[in-house]
């Protein structure tokens, strides 16, 4: 999410006025309320009430209320971020939730957003036309919103992939049936072929998508906002690498070897 918060922050300087569409009542494990201040005053923020089953999932898994990053400590970060979609031993609740998540909510639990969002945004765009639609995923359901909106309106659409879809490391841990796996691949292909442009976050993902579609696939890697790092950093004699994101047993950063 931070990726497009920062894009929205700097797009006005490039002559673009962003319109941000976001749920009015999302279900999240953690929130960073400081990010709202990053949205430029030129941007219009459009919200819509949605339904998603994640709240039910959290209760089933025994997870508590949403955690504000201001109060997040190292201890509860480890506790809250135990990811059942990896090689860890899972209890029956985790196994059941993974099976339901992978086979009933395709491509992800946010699929419940798609129809109401398309219906809402079609009406919005009739009164407030835009030059281009941009979706970012995961959740990959956001790309289904972009696909349907672009098909209905003819507006060019850019699909930004912050992670791959069916080649994501945890995809094989979802316990997919043959039918569900085929549907994932079919939806992924429809997004890649239906987009005006596809953006990948790494050369590897870019190459994978290029082999799958004739749609132009551009590369925009993750970066950082210099305003967030104004303080001078004193380096020591050690060589340090910071990895910000998931690093599971399935991940193999071959470039480092």
Please identify what each model-predicted range represents:
Residues 64-132, 184:
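Conserved nucleotide-sugar donor-binding subdomain of glycosyltransferases
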Residues 131-132, 140, 236-241:
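Charged active-site motifs of nucleotide-sugar-dependent glycosyltransferases
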Residues 204, 220-223, 235:
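Carbohydrate-associated surface elements
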Residues 225-257:
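Conserved catalytic-core segment of nucleotide-activated headgroup transferases in glycan assembly
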Residues 7, 14, 119, 141-144, ...:
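Membrane-proximal helix-turn-helix segments that form the acceptor-binding/catalytic region
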Residues 102-118, 133-153, 159-162, 167:
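An aromatic- and histidine-rich active-site surface loop
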Residues 1-67, 217:
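N-terminal subdomain of nucleotide-sugar transferases
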């Amino acid at each position: 999410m931070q990726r497009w918060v920062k894009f929205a922050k700097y797009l006005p300087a490039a002559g673009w006025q962003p319109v941000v569409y976001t749920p009015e009542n999302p279900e999240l494990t953690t929130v960073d309320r400081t990010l709202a201040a990053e949205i430029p005053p030129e941007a219009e923020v459009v919200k819509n009430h949605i339904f998603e089953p994640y709240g039910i999932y959290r209760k089933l898994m025994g997870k508590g209320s949403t955690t504000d990053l201001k109060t997040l400590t190292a201890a509860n970060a480890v506790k809250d971020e135990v990811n059942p979609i990896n090689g860890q031993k899972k209890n029956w609740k985790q196994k059941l939730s993974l099976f339901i998540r992978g086979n009933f909510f395709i491509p992800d639990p946010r699929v419940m957003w798609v129809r109401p969002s398309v219906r809402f945004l079609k009406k919005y765009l009739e009164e407030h036309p835009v030059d281009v639609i941009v979706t970012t995923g995961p959740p990959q359901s956001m790309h289904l919103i972009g696909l349907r909106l672009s098909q209905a309106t003819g507006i060019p659409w850019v699909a930004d992939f912050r992670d791959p879809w069916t080649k994501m490391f945890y995809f094989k841990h979802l316990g997919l049936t043959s039918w569900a796996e085929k549907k994932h691949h079919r939806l992924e292909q429809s997004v890649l072929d239906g987009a005006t442009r596809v953006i990948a976050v790494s050369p590897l993902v870019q190459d994978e998508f290029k082999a799958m579609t004739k749609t132009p696939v551009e590369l925009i890697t993750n970066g950082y906002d210099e305003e967030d790092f104004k303080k001078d950093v004193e380096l020591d004699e050690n060589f340090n690498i910071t990895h910000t994101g998931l690093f599971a047993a399935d991940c193999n950063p071959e470039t480092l070897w």
